[in-house]
């Protein structure tokens, strides 16, 4: 169980990675309480002064000019939650919901949303008791915030909707009972504060970001293994090459490969004097390609850490200034573009891996047995495993198409430009799964190739990586049922086993 004290607006990527990995016990710093109380009092004062302020005593969207009577204000907030809970599709994973609630608590507790502490505490209690609202994955365009997903989250606070507890779907009323909560009657603006925000898009994007980091680490390990398995040159990783180009991430990527390849590989030393001038690009240009991918990962890290700590509600309550202002912080364009760039990186990591794997099974290029198996003809070896990798790489090319360039007006053209951030971020999970599958196939192939170089050994780190695989999958001496081997290699990568082999500071959240 991860213990997380939220300092409003100060969540780190390392903390959020832990939230994504395991159940979390939340608490809030005492400093947050007065800020929320002052903000909530500012909203209450609007009602007392009989002012007209959007979201407090008006309708929403195109109905923003409709004044709501004082006796209907509680109904207004309840109605917006129930009417906006219009999502569709399979439910988000518990980890996604947990992340989404943590992000929402972080945003609301900064004191710009006019929401009472008891509502924020109730959200934390759901996480602390591992009661997760059932939230359909589909139904948000990422502006005016992630309305439908956040509405589904909020229904449980009212004793409505559904939740999941210990794998079972239960009613919202049962969820509150398990969490030790009573149904909440929302005060003015609180329903809107819960629904407005980019927390669903950002939760999906953070999951994709952490997966991209894991895949980058795995690809560096697999790529280094393939270099030695194919008797590739270490010269392309010379720091001088990358220093004169100047891209920091390329320089760091090359450093990662040198770290893995080491100085004392018997395989590397065995062909130092060979006459081969240049390796194919999939080996030689790894620092350039992976460096570009690393740059996209790092850029996304900056954007997503800011967004994770952002106030993306509307309107915003600036109690110290006596002002409540309507704006557009709910528009998730930064998240959409960060997710699109992550999609490019994830696709390219997989594409390069598939090409290395194809090189390994080609005996003319790798000088290894055809399809990495003895007695070819009788045995087909890795022939169709490479086809699987190719299929996954091709699928990712379609999924990598930018989502942020799409927009479809909603709410009778009041919300006439939207970000599509939720889809942009959500598809990263499928893309990461595809790339992980490609890398699993390469990992098996590279380990097979290294074993064919016996008795010569690779570097200490590469031998360690190979040993971790061989504890689960044995050498492929003849054809056997292949799918279980891919599944075991895939699971090894899913556990982020190779993150520990990366140099410190290479990846933002590690």
From Swiss-Prot:
Its main location: cytoplasm. There is a cross-link at residues 143-145 (5-imidazolinone (Ala-Gly)). GO terms for biological process: L-histidine catabolic process to glutamate and formamide; L-histidine catabolic process to glutamate and formate. The modification 2,3-didehydroalanine (Ser) is found at residue 144. InterPro entries: Aromatic_Lyase, Fumarase/histidase_N, HutH, L-Aspartase-like, Phe/His_NH3-lyase_AS. Keywords: Cytoplasm, Histidine metabolism, Lyase. Pfam families: Lyase_aromatic (PF00221). It catalyses: L-histidine = trans-urocanate + NH4(+). The keyword Cytoplasm applies. GO terms for cellular component: cytoplasm. One of its GO terms (molecular function) is histidine ammonia-lyase activity. Pathway: Amino-acid degradation; L-histidine degradation into L-glutamate; N-formimidoyl-L-glutamate from L-histidine: step 1/3. It is found in: Cytoplasm. PROSITE patterns: PAL_HISTIDASE. Contains an active site 4-methylidene-imidazol-5-one (MIO), which is formed autocatalytically by cyclization and dehydration of residues Ala-Ser-Gly. Signal peptide: none annotated. Its EC number is 4.3.1.3. Belongs to the PAL/histidase family. NCBIfam families: hutH, PRK09367.1. HAMAP family: His_ammonia_lyase (MF_00229). This is Histidine ammonia-lyase. It comes from Photobacterium profundum (strain SS9). The gene is hutH.
């Amino acid at each position: 169980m991860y213990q997380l004290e939220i300092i409003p607006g100060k969540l780190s990527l390392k903390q959020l990675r832990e939230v994504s990995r395991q159940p979390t016990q939340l608490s809030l710093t005492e400093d947050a309480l007065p800020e929320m109380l002052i903000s909530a009092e500012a909203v209450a004062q609007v009602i007392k002064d009989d002012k007209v302020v959007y979201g407090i005593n008006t309708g929403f969207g195109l109905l923003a000019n409709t004044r709501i009577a004082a006796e209907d204000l509680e109904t207004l907030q309840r109605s917006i939650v129930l009417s906006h809970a219009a999502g569709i599709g399979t439910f988000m994973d518990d980890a996604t919901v947990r992340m989404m609630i943590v992000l929402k608590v972080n945003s609301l507790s900064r004191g710009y949303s006019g929401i009472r502490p008891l509502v924020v505490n109730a959200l934390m209690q759901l996480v602390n008791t591992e009661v997760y609202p059932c939230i359909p994955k589909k139904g948000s365009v990422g502006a005016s915030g992630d309305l439908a997903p956040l509405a589904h989250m909020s229904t449980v606070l009212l004793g409505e909707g559904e939740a999941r507890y210990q794998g079972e779907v239960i009613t919202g009323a049962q969820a509150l009972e398990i969490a030790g909560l009573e149904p909440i009657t929302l005060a003015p603006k609180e329903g809107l504060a819960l629904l407005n925000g980019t927390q669903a898009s950002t939760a999906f994007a953070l999951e994709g970001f952490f997966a991209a980091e894991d895949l980058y680490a795995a690809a560096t390990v697999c790529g280094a293994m393939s270099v030695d398995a194919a008797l590739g040159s270490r010269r392309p990783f010379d720091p001088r090459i990358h220093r004169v180009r100047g891209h920091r991430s390329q320089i760091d990527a090359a450093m990662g490969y040198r770290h893995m390849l080491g100085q004392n590989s018997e395989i590397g030393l065995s062909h130092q004097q060979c006459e081969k001038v240049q390796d194919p690009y999939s080996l030689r240009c790894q620092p350039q390609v992976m460096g570009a991918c690393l740059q996209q990962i790092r850029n996304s890290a900056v954007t997503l850490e800011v967004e994770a700590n952002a106030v993306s509600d509307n309107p915003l309550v600036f109690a110290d200034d006596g002002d409540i202002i309507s704006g557009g912080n709910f528009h998730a364009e930064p998240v959409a573009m960060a997710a699109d760039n992550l999609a490019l990186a994830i696709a390219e990591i997989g594409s390069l891996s598939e090409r290395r794997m194809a090189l390994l099974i080609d005996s003319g290029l790798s000088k290894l047995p055809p399809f990495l198996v003895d007695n070819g003809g009788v045995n087909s070896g890795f022939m169709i495993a490479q086809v699987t990798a190719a299929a996954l790489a091709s699928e990712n090319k379609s999924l990598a198409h930018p989502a942020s360039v799409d927009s479809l007006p909603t709410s009778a053209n009041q919300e006439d430009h939207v970000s599509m951030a939720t889809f942009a971020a959500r598809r990263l999970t499928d893309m990461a799964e595809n790339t992980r599958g490609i890398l699993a196939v390469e990992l098996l192939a590279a380990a097979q190739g290294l074993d064919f170089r016996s008795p010569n050994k690779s570097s200490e780190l590469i031998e360690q990586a190979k040993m971790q695989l061989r504890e689960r999958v044995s050498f492929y001496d003849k054809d056997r049922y292949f799918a279980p081997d891919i599944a075991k290699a895939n699971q090894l990568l899913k556990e982020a086993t190779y993150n520990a082999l990366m140099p410190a500071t290479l990846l933002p959240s590690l």
